[in-house]
Amino acid sequence: MDHNIDQATKNYTIFCDLDGTLWEQGDPTEIAKPGYQPKIIHGTVGKIREWDSKGYKIILTTGRKESLREVTVKQLSYAGIIYDQLVMGIGGGSRVLINDLRPNGDKSAFVYQPKRNEGIGGLEL
């Protein structure tokens, strides 16, 4: 996919949602129950590790409440999902990323919206 960027200087920071993107959207009332482990969407762990090996910064975002951080971190660890930061409590509404264009006119932000529960396994940046 042509992003109109200089491929030689590609240095991505990836903001990626959890529920419905990395693992299947589950029942919000079940998330905090002891032993609950979300179902990982096929290709998730491999894609995250690929991005990490390329030096991309991986920032996970979720509408889950901050009070669920400990259980969420355990779920991520159990699933083998590595990341640089975890941003909790951003709510369930639409997300808007605002970023400037580079001086040469190249884009500095892109959006990908896979269908819920289809995951990121086939995503090529």
Enumerate the language-model features and the residues they cover.
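HAD-like aspartate-dependent phosphatase fold
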Residues: 1-125
